[in-house]
């Protein structure tokens, strides 16, 4: 009996862990890319070259446009991967991304990923007071919110701080639909009253 429970628990744990791994790997890739961009800017300064933002009606410094594209491609891939990830974004501290935009946010929902589009998540005064932002910023660590309901769906938000020279430059957020975990295996004919809860 114990082996059956262990096997079921391991199988379900792997399902949940795979979602967390996709989120963490994507956040780590974005963190590293942004950190490299900061290093390049510190070493080379501003080149004077600009490109139009995919989201805002502004010209971004070329390196920041490359960061924006990297964020988008990774978010589109992660959100449309068929996992429980329903949204992903990057929210910066004021003036921490590009001088052309004080409050720079970029977010990809499931519908955005399907259309290869994105959206703003509002101004700094709106997102900087949210627990997913403040806790990651203040602790300089990965945080997970308590479950909450958004448009009738139970969610958690995982947040990773963007650090450069030990200064928080922003936060990467990943929204996870915990209702997707209801597909966890809890069927065993030997144990008809068995259920799984995450």
Task: Kindly give the residue locations of the regions a language model identified.
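Juxtamembrane extracytoplasmic/periplasmic/luminal helical "stalk" adjacent to the first N-terminal
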Residues: 1-65
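Short regulatory alpha-helical segment in sensory/regulatory domains of signaling proteins that mediates
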Residues: 17, 35, 72-83, 186-191
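Amphipathic alpha-helical bundle/coiled-coil segments
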Residues: 17, 125-130, 159, 175
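Extracellular/periplasmic ligand-sensing ectodomains of membrane signal-transduction proteins
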Residues: 62, 78-141, 146-152
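Well-ordered, non-membrane alpha-helical segments in soluble/globular domains
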Residues: 64-74
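Conserved beta-strand cores of small sensory beta-sandwich domains that regulate signal transduction
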Residues: 89, 195-197
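Conserved beta-strands of PAS-like sensory domains
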Residues: 153-187
């Amino acid at each position: 009996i114990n082996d059956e429970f262990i096997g079921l628990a391991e199988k379900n744990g792997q399902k949940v862990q795979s979602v967390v791994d996709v989120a963490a790997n994507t956040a780590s890739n974005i963190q590293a890319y942004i950190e490299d961009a900061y290093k390049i800017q510190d070493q080379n300064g501003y080149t004077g070259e600009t490109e139009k933002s995919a989201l805002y009606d502004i010209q971004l410094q070329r390196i920041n446009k490359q960061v924006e594209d990297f964020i988008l491609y990774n978010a589109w891939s992660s959100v449309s991967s068929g996992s429980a990830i329903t949204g992903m974004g990057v929210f910066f501290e004021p003036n921490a991304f590009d001088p052309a935009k004080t409050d720079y946010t970029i977010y990809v929902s499931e519908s955005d990923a399907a259309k290869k589009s994105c959206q703003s998540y509002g101004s700094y005064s709106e997102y900087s007071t949210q627990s997913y932002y403040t806790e990651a910023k203040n602790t300089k660590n990965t945080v997970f919110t308590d479950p909450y309901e958004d448009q009738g769906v139970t969610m958690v938000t995982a947040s990773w701080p963007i650090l450069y020279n030990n200064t928080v430059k922003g936060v990467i957020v990943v929204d996870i639909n915990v209702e997707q975990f209801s597909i966890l295996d809890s069927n065993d004919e030997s144990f008809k009253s068995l259920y799984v809860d995450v």
